[in-house]
Amino acid sequence: MAELEIFDNGVSIEQIIPALDRDGAVIIRDLLSMEITTQIIEDLSETLEASTPGSKSGIESWEEFHGGKTVRFCGLAAKSRAFVDHALLNEYLIKVSDHYLLKSCADYWLNTGQVMAVGSSEPAQYLHRDEDN
């Protein structure tokens, strides 16, 4: 597996694209400020506390992969204005999406904004595409 390249916030999109092409992902340090991160966590904490850990699929292989102590939930845009303003509408996300998607379409939208709160002692997941998308 490739070691992901780490960039500082403020780097140009032109510097990021070659690493994305090569590795499929990058890390951008301090993409969201601590203040914004805290706000998103506060916005989502009630849903996190109310969510049951583990897979709801009933399929043993998915249950093992998802982890019995990990909580997942979607619909972040409806639960956190800070998520919309600072993550969903983040300049890097938009520029990267435009770079790759607008070559073959007139418009696009994000299908899922999801929290995955990995429980203690859960095994790490490898970098992967969901459902091979």
Where are these regions (language model features)?
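Non-heme Fe(II)-dependent double-stranded beta-helix
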Residues: 1-22, 29-132
